[in-house]
From Swiss-Prot:
Functional note: Removes 5-oxoproline from various penultimate amino acid residues except L-proline.
Gene3D superfamilies (alphabetical): Peptidase C15, pyroglutamyl peptidase I-like
NCBIfam families attached to this UniProt entry: PRK13197.1, pyro_pdase
Single GO MF annotation: pyroglutamyl-peptidase activity
Originating organism: Caldanaerobacter subterraneus subsp. tengcongensis (strain DSM 15242 / JCM 11007 / NBRC 100824 / MB4) (Thermoanaerobacter tengcongensis)
Active site: E78, C141, H165
Protein name: Pyrrolidone-carboxylate peptidase 2
One term under GO cellular component: cytosol
Keywords recorded for this protein, A-Z: Cytoplasm, Hydrolase, Protease, Thiol protease
The family this protein is said to belong to: Belongs to the peptidase C15 family.
First-listed, main subcellular location of the protein, grouped into a coarse class: cytoplasm
Domain of life: Bacteria
InterPro entries: Peptidase_C15, Peptidase_C15-like, Peptidase_C15-like_sf, PGP-I_bact-type, PGPEP1_Cys_AS, PGPEP1_Glu_AS
Length: 206
């Protein structure tokens, strides 16, 4: 069994992206599943292209994408991706789409196909705050989640997929008073816990 995990490079003036720091620290094997790791650029369309290339290469049982959501307090397991780009800031190559469909012929939205409620409950059992989020935003994170689910749907692939937003790391909020953060250790434990739930779910549906 293979689980593909994606993370982003830094964006918006940050020198690090916690999603990539978490990715680098994940175990290579979790519950018997090989963990395939890839960093994708914080760039509209190119992020999806890179993820799809890897999906074609490794044929994973599930894809879990991780992204930074500065200002959030907890591990946010996303429920839905919507078919719109509406960028508050430019991406890493200067693109800033406003009110633009990701795929003009795609569905209005796709729900995550990983077990989001079980993931939240298991993370909480590790004494790490977590919740279901009903919006992944309209920036590159939502774009990637939608793009992956859209690709899976259109090609009728038996691959589960979802997205988890994580807070800033403490080092990122040194000059951001009152902005929440979470330790790298807790975030790694949370994502590995989520992967365990996903692996169990994939085994059940085989």
């Amino acid at each position: 069994m293979k689980i593909l995990v994606t993370a982003f490079d830094p964006f918006g003036g940050e020198s690090i992206n916690p999603s990539y720091e978490v990715l680098k620290n994940l175990k290579d094997n979790i519950e018997g599943a090989e963990i395939v790791k890839i960093q994708v650029p914080t760039v509209f369309y190119l992020s999806v292209e890179k993820a799809i290339e890897k999906i074609k290469e490794v044929n994973p049982d599930a894809v879990l994408s991780i992204g930074q959501a500065g200002g959030r307090y907890d591990i946010s397991v996303e429920r839905v991706a919507i078919n719109i780009d509406d960028a508050r800031i430019p991406d890493n190559i200067g693109q800033q789409p406003i009110d633009t469909p990701i795929d003009p012929e795609g569905a209005p939205a796709y729900f995550a196909t990983i077990p989001i409620k079980e993931i939240v409950e298991e993370i909480k059992k590790e004494n790490i705050p977590a919740s279901i989020s009903n919006t992944a935003g309209t920036y590159v994170c939502n774009h990637l989640m939608y793009g992956i689910l859209n690709y899976i749907h259109k090609n009728k692939l038996n691959i589960k997929a979802g997205f988890i937003h994580i807070p800033y790391l403490p080092v990122q909020v040194l000059n951001k008073p009152s902005t929440p953060s979470m330790s790298l250790g807790d975030m790694v434990k949370a994502i590995e816990t989520a992967i365990k739930v996903i692996v169990k779910s994939c085994k059940k549906s085989r």
